[in-house]
Amino acid sequence: MNFISSHPAFNDTIDSLKNEFKDDKSNNVIICGAHDFSRTQSIDLYKKKYDKVIVFNQEPLTATQRQFMHKGYFDWLKQADEVWDYDKQNIEVLKLIRPDVKLHILKPYKDWSKYSPVEKDIDILFYGALNEHRRAVLEELKKKYKVVILNSWDGNVIDNHIMRSKILLNIHYYYESSMQEQARMIRWIGSPCRIISEKSWKNYLGVEEKEYSELLNV
């Protein structure tokens, strides 16, 4: 199995998939971020190179986030050998294009036991793109806790900060759809930290969740 992504935001997804399919010696490929590639490339480039092309969508496709659904992406979704998604809300949208779309939940992959304990000098760690919704929570939390907002795609830097943190906090970017950010939190599973997420419409990973108003008192 081969793996391709369009952005470092998919790094943890790719690592999870590599672990899951480590014994798969096929010439198939799983593509994350096809909505990006499809703006400038034809899927034919990949279909010629690989035996099977699997498009793994992870972008929210509810009514308020249709910017990801453009003609090029429609073509990719129609022509891919398989289409996967990790959220049932997206599945219902994708069924309009691909009735055979498959639900694929990410699986924990990281062995945190190999890391030596360090001093927990960070109360709350957050990383991810910022918007008004996320800033509002983080600014309030800063009044009571030592909050670190990390801006890095370097896995070693991220792991170092995770080990130093008491709480790993996930806040929805697209809070209207409240889809669980598996692509971020899958790295956290098994870490020596308390994981807290803003409440999702469905808790696939079984993490601790709180309503928006409750996040201010973690």
Named regions from a protein language model:
Residues M1-S26, I31-K48, I54-E214:
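Nucleotide-sugar donor-binding catalytic core of glycosyltransferases
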